[in-house]
Curated annotation (Swiss-Prot):
Protein name, UniProt field: Virulence factor-related M protein
Pfam family, one: Gram_pos_anchor
The species this protein was found in: Streptococcus pyogenes serotype M49
A single GO BP: phagocytosis
C repeats: 120-154, 162-196, 211-246
Matches recorded under InterPro entries: LPXTG_anchor, M_anchor, M_repeat, SMCR, SMDRR, YSIRK_signal_dom
Amino acid sequence: MARQQTKKNYSLRKLKTGTASVAVALTVLGAGFANQTEVRAEGVNATTSLTEKAKYDALKDENTGLRGDQTKLVKKLEEEQEKSKNLEKEKQKLENQALNFQDVIETQEKEKEDLKTTLAKATKENEISEASRKGLSRDLEASRAAKKELEAKHQKLEAENKKLTEANQVSEASRKGLSNDLEASRAAKKELEAKYQKLETDHQALEAKHQKLEADLPKFQRPSRKGLSRDLEASREANKKVTSELTQAKAQLSALEESKKLSEKEKAELQAKLDAQGKALKEQLAKQTEELAKLRAEKAAGSKTPATKPANKERSGRAAQTATRPSQNKGMRSQLPSTGEAANPFFTAAAATVMVSAGMLALKRKEEN
């Protein structure tokens, strides 16, 4: 654009120079014509020869031609001046356009710089976006791997939770069975104590009767001594029998007391063991519940905890057991724990021994289980 503007300026200067040259030439030519006309007029006045007249006519014609040429040149000069004015206007217009073009060029240069800056910024942002996309892809892969690992861990925890729930149910059933056996053992002890008290009372009555017979024996005559002797022997036999039964009852009561001590000790140990297991199970269940909650939060799932279903089943099972337990206990109270025979406060020593043995065996089985 600058080069074209320079060419236009040079053309305008050249046009101005040519126009000035034409004007100078016309001025000189007009002065020459005037001088020739004056000289020729003086010659005509001095001579009147035909030759001079012919020359005069020729010069006149030439002068007329030159004047015509001058008119043409003046007209051409005016046209050139008009062209010069038009060219000057065109020049001004072109200069204004050049200024406008310069503004446009500067604006375009500025826009070009802005575009370069925008392009550089967009390129940098594209690079950052590409790096961010790659980072997000890596994070997504890592998140998927972590999700798979968490799902596997969740399944493992669910399996462990199920096992712990089942173990807790078995432990609860064992504890309830042991409690029932202990209640049966206590009922048997009460019955043995009642029997012991009755035997003790009978023994004291027989002992008093025997002492009375011993005291009354010298008072009776000899003929009735045989009957008294028989009564005394019968009393002694009854006393021996009662004493034997009392001894057996004492032995059974001692055995029951010993078994009760063992049962209490085993019960305490088993209860402590069950309490420790229950506490460990509760802690593990709480820990697993917390881990399950974290897993559910990470998975953004609103499903219920699977571990609560076995708990609901356990509660319903406990409720059913609680509902059926009174009738079972009622039936057990009217029967012996080992033989199933009808309970009798005066049952035999063999039945008591079998009952105590059955209670001990049941306790050992519970402990082994």
